[in-house]
């Protein structure tokens, strides 16, 4: 047991009742975990308010509370054993409490945070692979899970809640990790999940309009400001000099110019590119290029696409900052494999088929344009859908992108959630036609497995087939129920069934 006051650290608070020296053994924000010895942080959420659960957790033995509201607004029993602390921001308080409760494990590792609308998973995975090739032990937290000692545990969010973050950091330290690499989402910054963390290196990849809506960001300006928070929480910043809004992100963050390192594919920078060769053979799809500047050497990249050169430059710049040996860096890049990110799943004498997470207009256009320009397929086929109960702008944008950038389009389901799949497909199809797409170059197949099978069965020689939108996701959500579905598995199963 500890005294609550030992965990308060940087937290500004007003003591409303009781004694901050109360004995506690853990921090909770979920009322279902209530038990004697816990301090309950009352977080006001979009769906539920933690303050409303005070009577319930009190009945389960909780006697220490961190709140945002006045005592008169709370239903707290009159009990001299109860301690109540009022704070300006309960989410910030949770982050500081969690850090202290686990002994500030984040500070015991070299830390790298990566933010961007697209590319976070690829860059964090590549940096981890490079570190491991260099003989360093690294933990990773991101969209595809938390990775410690070769073991993966699922994460609910790209950037988990602050308590879970510090719990994972503690496990990493216990496992002997020297480094931690994190995907840092804008939502994570907005909800103070990374509050109090100072990264040794922060990487800004790019930003484009996305995640703007009632449950996410109110405006692009807010989204931009949240992305910029990483640069205000790092000792050194690595930025993509080719991305839109990079200078604005630097300005908003307030980071000193001498702490910023720039990389570019288009022009000379601290790290840049020389000759580029795009490779597509029966055995390898990827890129060979020469890097110059802070990192120098030839790189063979097994991930297709121009934007993956950008992603790789970010990882190379971080490697240079960490003084990792160049030959080990190149070895790490070559062995990088990212589930659901430009992942080549199968090749035949007729087609190459791969999976990608592209789930909005910007990432879809970038992917399709790159494939056409760099690999020059005879035909570019795209299979995609849009999630239900989400902004309909994505349906319009992705339908338009398919009409403009693909030769043949298969519109299918993604996660329909509580909408009818047929309604979503119709919205996408209408946008496709309005953008000039031809009816004969498009088919609607609501069953995603059947859609994948159709594209492979009807493939023509030289086809590149992109199955996009779900990437690493291993489920489909229909009417609130998730059932197992992984694009990669389905492709291989259907390929075998078709004897291709």
Segments (PLM) and residue ranges:
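ATP-dependent carboxylate-amine ligase
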Residues: 1-15, 36-39, 49, 257-259, ...
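Acidic, Mg2+-coordinating active-site environments of NTP-dependent enzymes
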Residues: 10, 73-78, 175, 190, ...
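N-terminal leader/targeting and accessory segments in enzymes
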Residues: 1-96, 300, 304-306, 493-500
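Short, well-ordered alpha-helix to beta-strand connector turns
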Residues: 24, 36-37, 62, 81, ...
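Short internal beta-strands
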Residues: 59, 63-69, 237-241, 381-384, ...
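Short loop/edge segments at beta-strand edges and connector loops
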Residues: 67-68, 88, 142, 184, ...
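Short secondary-structure boundary segments
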Residues: 67-70, 184, 206, 241, ...
């Amino acid at each position: 047991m500890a005294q609550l006051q030992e965990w308060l650290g940087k937290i500004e608070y007003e003591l409303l009742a009781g004694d901050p020296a109360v004995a506690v053994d853990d921090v909770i924000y979920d009322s279902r975990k209530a038990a004697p010895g816990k301090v309950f942080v009352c977080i006001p959420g979009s769906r539920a308010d933690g303050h409303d659960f005070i009577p319930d957790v009190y009945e389960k033995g909780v006697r220490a509370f961190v709140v945002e509201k006045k005592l008169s607004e709370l239903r707290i029993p009159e009990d001299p054993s109860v301690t109540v602390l009022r704070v300006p921001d309960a989410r910030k308080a949770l982050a500081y409490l969690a850090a202290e409760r686990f002994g500030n494990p984040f500070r015991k590792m070299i830390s790298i945070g990566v933010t961007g609308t697209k590319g976070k998973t690829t860059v964090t995975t590549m940096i981890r692979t490079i570190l491991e090739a260099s003989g360093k032990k690294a933990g990773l937290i991101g969209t595809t899970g938390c990775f410690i000692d070769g073991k993966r545990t699922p994460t609910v969010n790209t950037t988990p809640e602050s308590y879970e973050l510090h719990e994972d950091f503690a496990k990493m330290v216990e496992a002997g990790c020297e480094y931690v690499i994190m995907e840092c989402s804008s939502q994570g910054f907005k909800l103070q999940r990374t509050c109090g963390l100072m990264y040794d290196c922060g990487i800004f990849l790019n930003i484009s309009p996305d995640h703007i809506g009632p449950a996410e960001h109110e405006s692009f300006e807010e989204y931009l400001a949240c992305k910029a928070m990483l640069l205000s929480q790092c000792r050194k910043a690595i930025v993509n000099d080719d991305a839109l809004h990079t200078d604005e992100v630097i300005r908003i963050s307030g980071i000193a110019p001498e702490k910023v390192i720039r990389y570019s594919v288009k022009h000379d920078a601290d790290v840049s590119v020389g000759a580029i060769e795009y490779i597509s053979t029966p055995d390898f799809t990827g890129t060979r290029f020469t890097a110059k500047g802070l990192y120098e050497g030839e790189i063979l990249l097994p991930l297709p696409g121009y934007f993956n050169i950008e992603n790789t430059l970010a990882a190379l710049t971080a490697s240079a900052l960490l003084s990792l040996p160049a030959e080990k860096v190149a070895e790490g890049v070559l062995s990088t494999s990212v589930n659901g990110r430009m992942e080549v799943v199968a090749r035949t004498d007729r087609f190459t088929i791969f999976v990608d997470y592209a789930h909005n207009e910007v990432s879809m256009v970038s992917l399709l344009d790159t494939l056409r320009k760099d690999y020059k397929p005879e035909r570019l086929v795209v299979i995609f859908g849009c999630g239900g109960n989400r902004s309909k702008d994505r349906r319009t944008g992705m339908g338009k992108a398919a009409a403009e950038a693909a030769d043949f389009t298969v519109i299918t389901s993604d996660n329909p959630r509580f909408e009818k799949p047929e309604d979503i497909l119709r919205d996408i199809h209408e946008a496709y036609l309005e953008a000039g797409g031809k009816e004969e170059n498009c088919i609607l197949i609501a069953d995603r497995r059947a859609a994948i099978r159709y594209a492979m069965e009807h493939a023509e020689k030289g086809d590149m087939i992109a199955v996009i939108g779900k990437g690493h996701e291993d489920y489909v959500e229909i009417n609130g129920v998730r059932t197992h579905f992984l694009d990669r598995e389905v492709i291989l199963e259907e390929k075998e069934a078709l004897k291709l």
